[in-house]
Amino acid sequence: MFPTDPVSNLAALIRCPSVTPAEGGALAALEAMLAPVGFKVDRVVAKEPGTPDIENLYARTGGEGPHLMFAGHTDVVPVGDEAAWSRPPFSAAIAEGEMYGRGAVDMKGGIACFVAAVARHIEKHGAPKGSISFLITGDEEGPAINGTVKLLEWAAARGERWDACLVGEPTNPDCIGDMIKIGRRGSLSGRITVHGVQGHAAYPHLADNPVRSILQIAQALMDPPFDDGTENFQPSNLEVTTIDVGNTAVNVIPAKASAAFNIRFNDRWTAESLMAEIVARLDRAAAGSALRPGRAPARYEIVWNERPSHVFLTRNNALIDSLSGAVEAVTGRQPQLSTTGGTSDARFIKDYCPVVEFGLVGKTMHMVDERVALADLETLTGIYETFIARWFGHAAA
């Protein structure tokens, strides 16, 4: 039986407790949907010392011609306090036209809809005029070490090549059809430690308080603004996310203080140029402090996150036009082409082929009582089905 009903597909996926890193039966359920449609399915276990093994899935159907990939994840975030849920988080309960469950929106719902869309397309038109593949990880909500990155490497090593990719993350703020993500800002994180001299709070002249310096350094990182945005991206923004001293004694000046930060940056910067700008700001703040009269520059060190995410923008007109045209045909809305929000696994896929993102409404993702309207599942399936037909029509032209 073809899995043409997104509601049934989603219920089967939600009932699998696939909290990262557990597979929870979700990939097995997905494989059971794809096999009857003619997909060859591979389950790929990725490993890395010091991290949990992660099971992933790659499936492909079709033959020669353009190759369209759908990417996503079956892993979900923890449910939190289960007693706070109005319905069990892995029950796929339906009430008042909505299905409840962890992953309903992020992003088992998107997977369920694309499976249904592909099944409907093949049922109506036969095999695609090319190939369709699913690249599904169990490690998106976690550290993302043994997930999409390694699955892409595995598939590419086998000779897989893709012409375009659609990621089914929830991209719409309010209604299906609001927004398509055509790129993402970069993300860079670091931790700064300022070293001082420990001493008695009553004798500050005998000590060197690093808290004074870390506060000034934190301010220098955030102000002035890094830029005022670009044509396709909002202004780069740095947030200091924590300041830590680890000192419980109120009469002791600490020996060191640290601060962590994250910056989301636009295409005016690379990770490397941004690092240089941040270090220049740190040097100026450390050297010229009115809070440190008569003292040497503050001594600091910075440790960068090992894996910055690079900014990217997709300019593939056939892909974007096929998707935006499908959205408008089904919903009547002209979607906004956006680069807002956080990072996703599209940041890895962009190194292999053009990629865009479109899925459900994200209002309840990661929340207690995460849920999706059944009508939205049908609408998204219709958009995906229309997109498949339009994209293969463009690609074959």
Curated annotation (Swiss-Prot):
The keyword Metal-binding applies. This is Succinyl-diaminopimelate desuccinylase. Catalyzes the hydrolysis of N-succinyl-L,L-diaminopimelic acid (SDAP), forming succinate and LL-2,6-diaminopimelate (DAP), an intermediate involved in the bacterial biosynthesis of lysine and meso-diaminopimelic acid, an essential component of bacterial cell walls. Disulfide bonds: none annotated. Binds 2 Zn(2+) or Co(2+) ions per subunit. Keywords: Amino-acid biosynthesis, Cobalt, Diaminopimelate biosynthesis, Hydrolase, Lysine biosynthesis, Metal-binding, Zinc. One of its GO terms (molecular function) is cobalt ion binding. InterPro entries: ArgE/DapE_CS, Bact_exopeptidase_dim_dom, DapE_proteobac, Peptidase_M20, Peptidase_M20_dimer, Peptidase_M20A. The gene is dapE. Pathway: Amino-acid biosynthesis; L-lysine biosynthesis via DAP pathway; LL-2,6-diaminopimelate from (S)-tetrahydrodipicolinate (succinylase route): step 3/3. Homodimer. Its cofactor is Zn(2+); Co(2+). Belongs to the peptidase M20A family. DapE subfamily. Zn(2+) 1 binds at residues 73, 106, 169. Zn(2+) 2 binds at residues 106, 141, 366. Gene3D superfamilies: Zn peptidases. PANTHER family: ACETYLORNITHINE DEACETYLASE (PTHR43808), N-ACETYL-L-CITRULLINE DEACETYLASE (PTHR43808:SF31). It catalyses: N-succinyl-(2S,6S)-2,6-diaminopimelate + H2O = (2S,6S)-2,6-diaminopimelate + succinate. GO terms for biological process: diaminopimelate biosynthetic process; L-arginine biosynthetic process; lysine biosynthetic process via diaminopimelate. Its EC number is 3.5.1.18. The active site is at residues 75, 140. It is an enzyme of class 3 (hydrolase). HAMAP family: DapE.
